Every structure is written in structure tokens, then in C-alpha cells.
Amino acid sequence: MKTILLLTVSLLMTTMAAVNAQKQPAEFHGATPTKAHYQVVYQLNTDDDGKIKGTLRNIQNALDDPRLKGKLDVELVVHGAGVSVYRTDKPYEELVKGLQSRGVILAMCENTMRERKIDKKELFPFISYVPSGNGELIIRQQEGWAIMHP
């Protein structure tokens, strides 16, 4: 009988502690940056407007994160259908220019251009080119850059 009573009291106390813990505000406010510098590559390979804008917004959010201010290198690697973001006939020029003005490297895959028969004149004049988008991602990852594919 004592054992049942002790188990019941113990279970009740554990339950009450869990309920009280849930009522207290969370103390976690995100990871604390411990490095002097961070590097990230964002990969874009879709022409979906929502995903393009979401990726550009994610880059902006990373640049605006107070923990990363002045400590972040960013590159946007575009390949495949993602080429839409750099096309002069699409509505992304101001967004992309804004990111470049904040130091974001804007890279376009030359393999995609060749396969899709896209001339550089069809793309913004201020972007850079890499021989292969996948190659760029591989190199950056091996150099320690974080890879983001929203």
C-alpha cells in the first residue's frame, strides 16, 4: 500500500513540475555566435516566383540578423530554372541589386546558359559567372561554407 501511495505521489509531483515548466517563458534566444566570420551559399534552381522571393528574403534576413552583422559572406548560386532571377525581362532586378550592394556574390552557372541557349545580354550586366553551379557548391562546401537550399 505504501508503495502505491509513494508511486502516486511521485507521479503527481512529476506531472505538476512538467505543467509548471510549460508555463514559464522560454529562455532560449537562438544560438550564440562563437566565430569571427561565417559563410553561406544559397542555391536557387527554380523559376517559382514564391521560392525566388523567399530565397531572396532569406538572404536579406541572414544579412539583417544582429548576431551575424559584419560577420557574414553570402553567395547566391543560380542554375537550371533559377536563371529567371537574373533575367532582364523578370521583375527581380531591384531585389538582386539590393543584395549585391550589401556584398552578396551573384553567380550564374555557365552550363545552364549553354544548355538553355541563354546569351549574357539576356541577363543583368552586374552578375558573375561560374563554369558549373554544382561545381561552385561543391567547392564552397569543401571550403566550409554552409549550403542553403530554401
Please give the residue ranges for each predicted region.
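N-terminal secretory signal peptides
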Residues: 23-73
